[in-house]
Curated annotation (Swiss-Prot):
Family: Belongs to the heat induced plant HTT protein family.
Role noted for this protein: Mediates both basal and acquired thermotolerance via HSFA1s-directed pathways (e.g. HSFA1A, HSFA1B, and HSFA1D). Triggers the expression of HSFA1A and HSFA1B.
Gene: HTT2
Keywords from the named record: Cytoplasm, Nucleus
Protein name in UniProt: Protein HEAT-INDUCED TAS1 TARGET 2
GO biological processes: heat acclimation; response to cold; response to heat; response to oxidative stress
Signals that turn on the gene: Target of TAS1 (trans-acting siRNA precursor 1)-derived small interfering RNAs in response to temperature variations, thus reducing both basal and acquired thermotolerance. Up-regulated by cold (at 4 degrees Celsius). Repressed by trans-acting small interfering RNA (ta-siRNAs) siR850/siRNA255-mediated transcript cleavage. Highly up-regulated in seedlings exposed to heat shock. Induced by HSFA1s-mediated (e.g. HSFA1A, HSFA1B, and HSFA1D) promoter activation.
Location relative to the cell: Cytoplasm; Nucleus
Tissue-specific expression: Expressed ubiquitously, including in seedlings, leaves, stems, inflorescences and siliques.
GO cellular component term of the entry, any: nucleus
Chief place of localization: cytoplasm
Organism in which the protein naturally occurs: Arabidopsis thaliana (Mouse-ear cress)
Domain of life where this protein originates: Eukaryota
Amino acid sequence: MNMIQRFMQSMAKTRGLCHPDCVKASSEQEDYDASQLSIWWIMLGRKTTREKWMNQALSSLSKTCISIWWKMSGIRGKMCREREQPLTVKDCLECAFKKGLPRREHWAHVGCTFKAPPFACHIPRVPMKGEVIETKSLDEAFKLLIKQPVGARLHVFSPDLDNVGEGVYEGLSSLSRKESRYVGLRDVIIVAVNKSEGKTVATVKICYKKKTSFVKVCLSRMFVQLGGGEESQVKEPTGLLVDFCIPRLSIN
């Protein structure tokens, strides 16, 4: 048995487990970039009839492997150094289409901080064919939503988002303006758009502070300042949801 075979065998024995150092680091982390989860919410979401054939292949993949595969591919470190920005759903989707993804049994944890094993590049992967469709327009995002859930990024203010509960999230509220702080953009998936309390709202699924939840987001709220200071200014009025995208899977 060669080294690669022994490596694959050892992974099969430890499926579903993660390195203790990674578990400890994760438990100490207040929040994390959930783009790795968002990609799977989108790709495992509703499919058109033309794409139903993908269900079986996608179900064999793990939503927990994308960040590890990104690290293995060597793309993550290079892109983060060049851009000095966190990965987005679009980045992860493009990596999936370009490199393929490992299967469920090969990785156990999203965002594993433990060093990738030396033979990680030999892990078998499921090929993915398709392209990433982007739009900046909310109207175009609504059209995409007819066929499947849409990925987006949400401007997050704390404690406004923490305290929204069953209400409608409107970003920085006047009641908590003094104690609010701008956290940044977080990846979400838009699952529905409807009326609530007389407002047009989007229901989004979000991973925030290690919790997955559904939040109603006001679509009519616009602002030009995210918080205090010049760095918080945006170039033009913006809504709470931005950077919409979906994967278009190909059968060719």
